[in-house]
Amino acid sequence: MAFAANSAVAAPTPAPTKATATSNAACPVTPGVTPAGITLGWIGSKTGPAATTYLGSSEAAQLRVDQENAKGGINGRKLTLRVYDDASNSTTQISQAQKAIADGVFGLNANASTVSMWPTLKEANIPVTGFSNPAFGTDRNAFGVVGASTSSNPAISSTGLLEKLKSMGATKIALVNHISAGSVSTFNALQNLIQYVPGMSLALRIPDSPQGAHDATSEALRIKNSGADSVAYSGFIDGGISLAQALKQQGVTLKAMNIVGLSDPAILRTSGGALEGALGTTYGALPVGVNVRAMKTYASAMKAAGLNSYSPAAPLGYIGADLLIKGLKVAGKCPTRQSFIDNLRQVTNYDGAGMIPEKVSFMPGLFPNGNPPRCTWYSLAKGTDLIPDAQVTCGARYIDTSTGKVVLS
């Protein structure tokens, strides 16, 4: 995969002034920070089965870093972003996290489904931004760009998706997920939640769908025989496409199908109509086609850099870098990892560069790291276009499925 990391600079990076450099030199020595620069990192899947899901994420992160450098950096310090490929592999992810620490990286932007690195990063007190993984709900050093992750507590789930599918006519749902910590935990909770959504019932659960593109014929036949009229899929986008194509081949007509990460209309042009009517959800950012200035600015900047703004994880790479920048700005003139974590934990109105449906507080809430998101902006596949809803959908209720109690609304 080609890297465009150094091609996204919109303007020459101003050099720190002599006065700024002299002032910064008075700061205590700390990992990743010099008087003239700060070293950050992106870690995730550049290769392996998850690679297509995370296409463009590191490049989008580099774009946000370049934009900040073009404005002079942070307190005169230029930002550098290093990329670490976990190869969609648990062992490799740990070694890459250890390498980032050895390289003196100040903090990381994580875009990955693999979760083996989190104890290592927590122990080293490395600030991390990203999404989905359980650590974003519990680990003090981990900051979820769209809020706390529910996957740290498999008993808690949001009614948002089920209510949306119900509004499309769904009554009997098949839940399909591949094996990753986030997908398994989220869909375990979703399965237990169905009983608390009147008019919805579980037709089938497939908890071990293969990762990535695969022959999904057997899954399609199981869904067909279950009598399901709707499907919710969580996994790598290629796996969702495989399932949709197999369902079409088996003549299965659904009232609703949701694929997490369905955000790129280019996919519709190569799927043979299998995704017609599918409900797309991003990984937490607004859809690129929505009429919001920040999304238009992001899309234009990505296009100018020769990058695909529609890639599912690309907006999260950009926002993850933005959150690292936000944390550095609130960490003080002499930033340390600890001041980054302590001060960013006090922020209650982070707006994700204007690219997320609601502002995020990093103060304790339903989870130690705050509240999970209650708003989602959906899109619908029509022909070769993904049409965003006219407005964001909010008001999701979070239910503790072990008790049936509403814990957040």
Where are these regions (language model features)?
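An alpha-beta-alpha
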Residues: 144-207, 230
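Extracellular/periplasmic bilobed ligand-binding domains
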Residues: 124, 187-283
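Periplasmic-binding protein-like
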Residues: 100-112, 129-131, 172-177, 227-237, ...
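Segments of small-molecule ligand-sensing domains
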Residues: 304-311, 326-388
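Extracytoplasmic "Venus flytrap"
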Residues: 22-62, 84-90, 176-186, 287, ...
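Secretory targeting and sorting signals
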Residues: 1-12
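Extracellular/periplasmic periplasmic-binding protein-like sensory domains
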Residues: 148-151, 247-318, 392-395, 404-408
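Beta-alpha junction/loop-to-helix N-cap segments that form part of ligand/metal-binding clefts
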Residues: 26-28, 52-59, 71-138, 208-216, ...
